[in-house]
């Protein structure tokens, strides 16, 4: 399994293949289209991530001391972002998530791609992932 750093580098290299912001958006949309199916029973307010322009649901599941997530959004860009975040931080020990260097995500240069509202949404998703990790430590 790749480390968090290796996963972030993978997404950086993938995004760097595109010169145009629209192509990067298409990459995010492709991530959303390839996401796992979200169980409908979790589509409720208790799993909704506040602070996102779109509706985003993030559900933790702990199995064999590995934290992973069910996730979904009603908007492709947001769903693409939550897909990437859950791929980077999912299937890991909660302590590994808590102790990771979240500033490494800055290498993805999302601040130049996303609108301020979407950046806030990504921040909210990341905070929810941290919150879930902390709750299982």
Give the location of each predicted region.
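N-terminal intrinsically disordered, cationic/polar leader segments
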Residues: 1-55, 62-66, 105-124, 128-137
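Solvent-exposed interaction patches of small proteins and small membrane subunits
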Residues: 46-53, 69-73, 95-100
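Conserved interaction-surface patches within small, structured recognition/assembly domains
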Residues: 61-75, 86-90
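Short Cys/His-based metal-binding microdomains
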Residues: 77-81
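Glycine-rich phosphate/pyrophosphate-binding loops
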Residues: 91-108
């Amino acid at each position: 399994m790749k480390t968090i750093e290796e996963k972030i580098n993978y997404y950086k290299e993938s995004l760097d293949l595109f010169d145009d912001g629209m192509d990067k958006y298409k990459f995010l949309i492709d991530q959303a289209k390839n996401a796992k199916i979200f169980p409908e029973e979790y589509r409720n307010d208790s799993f909704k991530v506040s602070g996102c322009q779109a509706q985003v649901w993030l559900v933790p599941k702990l199995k064999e001391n590995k934290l992973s997530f069910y996730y979904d959004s009603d908007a492709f860009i947001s769903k693409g972002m939550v897909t990437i975040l859950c791929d980077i931080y999912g299937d890991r020990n909660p302590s590994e998530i808590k102790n990771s260097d979240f500033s490494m995500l800055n290498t993805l240069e999302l601040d130049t791609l996303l609108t301020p509202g979407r950046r806030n949404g990504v921040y909210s998703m990341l905070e929810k992932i941290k919150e879930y990790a902390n709750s299982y430590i």
